[in-house]
Amino acid sequence: MERVRETGEKIIKAAAVGAMALLFVVFFLLFLQGFTFYEDAEFLYSFAKVPELAVLCGLAVLFFVILYAALGKWLSACRIKTIRIVEAVSAAVMLALQCYFLFYVRSYYKWDSGFVIGGAASLVETGSVAEEAFYYLSVYPNQNTFVLITAVLVKLGNLFGIGAGVRSLLFNTFNTVCLDVSVFLTLKLLQKWKKNLRDWEICRIFLLFLCNPFLYLGVSYYYTVTLSLPLSMGFLYLLLSIWEPEGGKEQENGESGGKKTCAGYGKAVFAGALLGIGYELRATAVILGIAALAAGIWKLAAQKETVARDGNTTRRETVARDENPARDRKEGKRQAAQLAVLLLCAWMFGAGLNAAQKAYVGIDTEDTAFPASHWLMMSLTMPGGHNGEDEAYTASFATKEEKEEAVSARMKEKLEAMSRADYLTLVKTKISNTFGTGTNGYPVFLADALRTDGVYEAVFGAHKDFVILWHQGYYLFLLLGILLYILRWGYACIRKKETDFYGFTLLLILFGAVLFYVLWEASPQYSIPFMMMMEALCFAGLLPVQNTEESAGQKGKMQKRHCVTAYCAFAAAAVVALWGIARYRQVTQTPGEQPHPVATQILANTSCPVDDGEELVQTIRLTQPFNRLIVQWRNPAQEESTAVYRLQLRESGGTVVFETEIHAAGTGYNGAGIYDFETVDPAEGDYEIAMEKISGMPSDDLEFVVYDMYGYTPYSDGELSLAKEGEKRILTASLLFSVSEEKTESYTTPQKYVIFISLLFLIFLFMGFWCKLKVVSVAGEER
């Protein structure tokens, strides 16, 4: 029996080490690829070759590595009071930046959330799902939890008199709270996981956390990928609490073991609730449950092995035990029971919530919902993301059985048409698109904003290259820390016979996420639910270096490392200066197209017909120069149409800025107008885009493209109205339009370029001198 137990444990350990080795290989390849995988930096990609792109991204990664070291040298010498002040000021700056993006820039997530907001608002106000959102919620019933959350927020907004036009602020405020709570929980998790963390180390981690640009850009990402973050991190924090052994501080403080056990079961129930709700909100939460179960089984098996040997082992396992085998046995039973309670509660809460939300939404999705195999089938089309053709194919079948049969047949056809090399290329593309970029798709999903002045151009517009580099450098910094942690975990597991089961749980979640998106629909945004886990693993991988140095007192090695850090900073400063000189003409004197959006609304789901005697008017706010207007329409009569429309862009007072005619004759069903005119400096007050029929048969009407979703108007700075014979009817919709300034000029001015390069050079230089000065203080025993 003893030999069977040993063999079983060896098999489990071998499988775990093998999985971590595969995860290391995947992340290492992503790390290498990441140095040239940031194509959203369009200006840099327009002239830079692969080596230059790799060097620029390498500078970004090196910046965060040096910053991590420099902050450690500074904060380790600070008093507690200073550290607290730094934390408070940093938190205030973070909140200020979040408020700027939340309340001023006001970008918005373009896709699914609109249907959910409209459906939730109609449920609250009419008791049924709006027609505009019905298809989406009938096809994707997995969004019902998202609908419930949104409905609660709509009710809260109605209570405080918040109208449909500004509801997005309420939703995004809630989204920001979710982001900040997840950051707080991640920091608390690290403190509980790495118990020897000192105050200055926690402060350093917090400051590096604040360098993550998603904390600011993501405030408007009202979607399940962000709303699920606090649920996931709360679950993982409670899981770590459950796995802690009884005793310790509680016994020292006179607390009874029974009270600790009851609290443990309470945590298990709460963790199960978070996992169940998280699963209903986003199905990838099942990966957390599977990882917790797998790691828990291994942990309990290793603990049982140790107890069976009566404590007389030659191997060391990092399990909760003391010198009393009976107590160890009791501890193992407690943890097994609490893990079982956790999983049972997750199932109960998930099933209960699922039933409640189905009853609330009130849509029979038996035949309309897509089968799970649909996403497997759809992801077999390069590049492995969502595509409308496969969605239309699945939706065209009436019943559940027909959908499953048709999807299975189409999946088989796709697989038979693919060679092994094609499939491997698809897998590589899906993994790269999901876990290979640090932007999380924000240039696609969040680029549309209400305000396009201020920092918009540098973050979302044609000058976003530096911010893209910042994203990619920070993400590769995270991957570097994770790779270091995997190496340390593997070394401890194989050589020292020590297993960090909690770290293994986090790694197993990432491993499961990679496998999941090999099979499922892939997208850059789908790595967001795992962002905080990656942060925790990164800092866990970086922390042991500092702790080992100080605990061992290896000051000679410290001095050498500080010197290396300083010289790396000096080298980076030199590269920045040389690159700045070499690319001066390219950046400051080479003309290129520099489009700048002034007011934009690109969501569309229907069209609004404009009959004889009617005028469709969209009011907009323009605060920057503009010279281009774009609108779209539908022409049901197509080539035979006789309709002629007048299109005007005018001030609210009536002064016409631009006017043209739209002739529908000889055109197809889908039409668009791109109109250029002399650059106009905006006047005070609002502007209007007006469409009016001036001739043609009564039956030949154009229908202008709009976004009409009950309770959700994506363009909140104006209203859409339909006027006829002096009467104006306000529509709960937004016209699809774009007003922009198209200009040809250099990327930036010489003055701005010199200032930017000089600042970057001085920052690297300062960090290098700081590290060098700290070497002197270490050698002189002044720390």
Residue positions per predicted region:
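Short hydrophobic/aromatic helix or loop-helix immediately within or flanking a transmembrane segment
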Residues: 119, 135-165, 173-176
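Extracytosolic helix-loop segments that constitute the early lumenal/periplasmic catalytic or substrate-binding loops
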Residues: 114-139, 145, 384-389
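Multi-pass, polyprenyl lipid-linked donor-dependent membrane glycosyltransferases
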Residues: 171-178, 204-239, 278-288, 526-531
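Membrane-interface anchor segments at the N-terminal boundary of transmembrane helices
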Residues: 43-58, 170, 429-510, 562, ...
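Transmembrane-helix motifs of polytopic, lipid-linked glycan transferases
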Residues: 170-195, 234, 481-490
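Start-transfer (signal-anchor) and selected internal transmembrane alpha helices
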Residues: 1-99, 326, 331-345, 563-569, ...
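Membrane-interface alpha helices of multi-pass inner-membrane proteins
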Residues: 206, 267-282, 293, 514
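Membrane-proximal stem/loop segments at transmembrane-domain junctions that anchor or position
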Residues: 129, 358-450
